[in-house]
Amino acid sequence: AKGANVTDDKGIVDFLNLYENAVQVDPRSPQEMIDEAVAAAKQSDVVVAVVGEAQGMAHEASSRTDITLPQSQRNLIAALKATGKPLVLVLMNGRPLALVKEDQQADALLETWFAGTEGGHAIADVLFGDYNPSGKLPMSFPRSVGQIPTYYSHLNTGRPYNPEKPNKYTSRYFDEANGPLYPFGYGLSYTTFSVSDVTMSSATLPRDGSVTASVQVTNTGKREGATVI
């Protein structure tokens, strides 16, 4: 079942189709498409919903002020969640999105970005457990657009917030947590790993020099897998 159009916003659809027929709009009503998807979900053991952006929403000269999923897709996810079936969201997007609500609704999220011609096979391998996902996020996912810029290892200036020593006069959001929803380097697996015995070739880094780090990585789970350090 299709479930929803990428967006029901005619202005965005017109923009995406300005130079090419990039997005095809289903003429059925949003509720009709949702009803069809819910009927299929009720007959399923697990619901897999593919959501995200059209490719034209994330390329050059395609900035967005709202980085949540389009409302049409959010309505679909809410309806699928209401069925009570396990819900897996497959994300196709070209930028970090604000997914606070979806994080609460989904039992699992698989980030695929914009995959190539064999993307469908690769996604199926992960979903069916034939391949163990091992990727980590190359960028942080904010909780909302108001957190941008949020990135790993940024320079704390002024009076940065310390959660262990809260103070009224420190830099923080009072309506949201300070950290990102998914930080740089975040990623789950069907197994678990432990990292130990971290050693450095030198305690100092000379100008134009290098330092080599070594670690011991152990698969502590019951499935084969790989990870990124």
Predicted segments with their positions:
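Secreted, periplasmic, or luminal enzymes acting at the cell surface/secretory milieu
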Residues: 1-25, 92-226
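Hydrophobic helix-and-loop "lid/oligomerization" segment in the mid-to-C-terminal part
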Residues: 9-104
